[in-house]
Amino acid sequence: MPLEMDQKVNKLTFGCQRSSTSDDDSGCAMEEYTWVPPGLRPEQVQLYFACLPEEKIPYVNSIGEKYRIKQLLYQLPPHDNEVRYCQSLCEEEKKELQMFSGQRKKEALGRGNIKMLSRAVMHAMCEKCGEKINGGEIAIFVSRAGPGVCWHPSCFVCSTCNELLVDLIYFYQDGKIHCGRHHAELLKPRCSACDEIIFADECTEAEGRHWHMNHFCCYECETVLGGQRYIMKDGRPFCCGCFESHYAEYCESCGDHIGVDHAQMTYDGQHWHATETCFSCAQCKVSLLGCPFLPKKGRIYCSKACSLGEDVHASDSSDSAFQSARSRESRRSVRMGKSSRSADQCRQSLLLSPALNYKFPGMSGNADDTLSRKMDDLGISRQGAGFDNDFWKARDEQETPEDHEEWAEHDDYMTQLLLKFGEKGLFQQPSEDNRSTEHWMSENIKGKNDLQRNNRNKSLASKKYQSDMYWTQSQDGLGDSAYGSHPGPASSRKLQELDMDHGASAYMHEKMPWYKRSLECLSDNLKPQNENIRDSMDSLALSNITGASVDGENKSRPSLFCYQNFQDLNTRDCEKMSNMGTLNSSMLNRSTESLKSLTSEICQEKPPPEEKPMHTSALRRSKSQTRPQVKFSDDVIDNGDYGSIEIRQPPMSERSRRRVYNFEERSQRPHHHRRRKSRKSRSENALHLATDSKPSGKERNRFYTAEDYERLFHNKSAHQVQAYIQNADLFGQYSNAASNVGLPSKVAGKFLGLYGEDEDSWCSTCSSSSSDSEEEGYFLGQPIPKPRPQRYQYFSDDLCSPTNALSSSQFSQRTTKSKKKKGHKGKNCIIS
């Protein structure tokens, strides 16, 4: 045996000292090693093993010995060289194995030579670590690498596995030394199942390793997994079924296997399906995916309250109330901001979808029938239950959220109008939450409740005012600039709805669609504005839109009108200011201040004893009036055409001096042109009550007495009565007031002093703004609008409020587009 030969040589030649426990005189100095390097003296063997780690020295019956045996089998696999150790080779593969083994031995196999360097050698370097090997030290040389290449004994390892080459056996390949296993794998793939070299033409490659085709199978059931799904566990392939049955985890929530196809959540040795159902709070079942959780007693919770077993949904009554309020506010916010629309679009959607005569559900037919019915139903006080109580009750009860419609998707405002109303003759009013607003009412209103309850006549006017109040309340919350700041059809449409309160179906004879009128209104904004007295008038027009007073933003006005009928009808809705202000500012033209009748017999208020000097108050623009001027469409223009209304005229002593018409002739006279009459200011509403066309000279001296009016209505036909009524501005609203009011002489004198015979010198404020170079009666080549004759003048006792006027937009009708931009010059003033 080679080992015995080495031992004999070492004993006889060197007689080196042994580290074993055997007797030194036994002559068995090398017997303590299971293997020693060949060709070395005992002192050289000792020097060599001294360079190795203690656990790798092959002492007999030591760990080093076991390590050596293991490395022999691993680094030098017997099935890489001998056919008899192979299990599944065919004849062709056996022959190929023999050829492969012989070629490796011939070309790469070798054993390292241990030599002690001469002291003269000064520049030897280790190939592994690159450090210097000094003279007199042990070094290992490899014949296949060349004479000058050497390694330290501890550096003589496989280049692949970095393990000491067992028994100094190496395979040299491409300048590197390898063990037999890894050298063979450089040439041929090795099967991970049988550990044999694969000589077949085909193999399976998975997980960075190779298998024989039939060797890549489930480790449990040996099912071939080539082309199939598999799971690697501890370096071994398993089919899905075997893996789930042997290694799959159980879900802590549902108790089922967590399959290979399911993601799982793991915490502290527990496993859950990675689903919202399984990985959820054990108390409230809220999903905890991606959320922090609180583990407690093998269960997970979303909060400390749930871990204590509390019901997070339980709450006291106050908390429920807050939650309910938040829910309502949330729903309101969703309604107001749906479809990502801007605030203006939301306001427009509320403005532009009212139902047809939604304030008058009973108003139908032509204008004559409607107005006649309205005047017949009008009473002294606000009526009780009306014929449309059910309608208002239904409106109060229903709350329908505004549906998402196609027109709301368009950014262009006119496109929205055409899409929503282009082919509809009816409007639809979305109901809105009723929100109570502050009632700005005069004190004596509350005392008239008994009289109102007793009067059971079904007054359409009463329902109209109820609808005004309802409209004001339901539109609350849009902001005080909802209409005043928008110069487009929104403001126009809003004022048109106000006029529908008074005129209802007076527009029925003109079938032009409303959106065309709105388009005309938009065109007005593109025209230049005149810089004259209209500046102050325009500021008042803005006041009408935004609801701000000329005298201040929020200045409260004293209630001067105490007439029971109109006091209650108007203050209920007019003095109740909403956030929008459009309705209320328009209705203030017939508010308690402007409806203080000079001829009231019910309230015997006397004018102030001393005569205050007449002067025009300076107009001050408020904050809300600094916005761009709002133009109104033809919807708000009053031209004085009204339906047939029964009217009683006051006596001559109660009427101001003015020109009147021959109403019978006027009804047959064609309208060559109709001048525009818009809400330029509140004074315009009060003073611009004259007729539209100039009367002839013979008509100027003709006056009607109260008896003439009565005879006219009793003797004339319905058509003539209608023609007569077409110039009546205020009787349509206050028909029953004629016989109940009287005119104090002092106030009448003061009023007649303001309205003199010379219509061109009404007021210094207006006349001073007129150009002296202009032709009399014309301005900029256009006729100056003439005041319309009044039947009553309503103003306060001291004439101190700029709002002492009735709305001039009642029962208004359209004018031609060419007259829309003509400014109102010098014939209007403010009563201060």
Swiss-Prot record:
A lipid is attached at C829 (S-farnesyl cysteine). Signal peptide: none annotated. Residues 669-680, 816-832 have a biased composition (Basic residues). Residues 830-832 form a propeptide. It is found in: Cell membrane. It comes from the Eukaryota. Residues 432-453, 603-614 have a biased composition (Basic and acidic residues). GO terms for cellular component: plasma membrane. Residues 124-188, 189-249, 250-313 form the LIM zinc-binding domain. Expressed in the dorsal marginal zone of early gastrulae (stage 10). As gastrulation proceeds, expression expands to include the lateral and ventral marginal zones, excluding the few rows of cells above the blastopore lip. Expression moves dorsally with gastrulation cell movements, and by the end of gastrulation expression is seen in dorsal mesoderm and posterior but not anterior neural ectoderm. Expression becomes down-regulated in mesoderm but remains strong in posterior ectoderm through the neurula stages. Keywords: Cell membrane, Developmental protein, Gastrulation, LIM domain, Lipoprotein, Membrane, Metal-binding, Methylation, Prenylation, Repeat, Zinc. It is a peripheral membrane protein. GO terms for molecular function: zinc ion binding. PANTHER family: LIM DOMAIN-CONTAINING PROTEIN (PTHR24211), PRICKLE-LIKE PROTEIN 1 (PTHR24211:SF15). Interacts with dvl2/dsh and mapk8/jnk1. Acts in a planar cell polarity (PCP) complex; polarization along the apical/basal axis of epithelial cells. Regulates the polarized assembly of fibronectrin on the surface of the mesoderm during gastrulation. Essential for gastrulation cell movements, cooperating with dvl2/dsh to activate jnk. Acts together with tes to control axial elongation. This is Prickle-like protein 1-B. It comes from Xenopus laevis.
